[in-house]
Amino acid sequence: MDPFATGGGMLQTEDQWYIFYHRQTNRSSYARQACAEKLERRSDGGFQQAEITSCGLNQGALKGIGTYEARIACNLWSINGTGRYDGKSPKQKLKDHPYFTQSGKDRENNGDQYIANMKNGAVAGFKYFEMGEANQIGITIQGNVMGTMQVSDKSDFENICAEIEVNGSGKEMHTYKGALNIPSGKRALFFRFQGEGTVDFHSFELMKD
């Protein structure tokens, strides 16, 4: 596999196989971010289809305590669903959709990628975390916003695990915190903005008080 290509490929390291692929950033089909997922073998020697997660080359679920950058989200959609960047005028057509970007130009180091343009009803999903200790959650965002960031372990938000009030303006980073009530075990985390304005979502922290 060419390690510099993001078109996709399989790699074996010791006894474990991984699939490498890419996804689009900056609302362009020409801006690409390399990603990887762990593969599981079937009894016939083939591979099960890999689920897209936030775990990458990590050996299992991420720790349920710590700070994580929003750029590791594996699900991202607006109140109107998802879209494709390979059509005509994608930036205009998808102007109400969230997207991955960074400050400044693309670069090989000192990255600060984040999720931009989260409007009312937009969702960012992260899979998976080994929960059990955290009972507080914080989010670091910027933007002119007023509303609530809801957190759930379900993509349909049937179970609300946290509601964090947000009220900020300008380009300053703001951190907001709230109580977290989530079942123990391997869990996903979905963040949904409900309110006015546009959120740039930079990171979140899982904490124990």
Predicted region positions:
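Carbohydrate-active catalytic/glycan-binding domains of CAZyme proteins
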Residues: 1-209
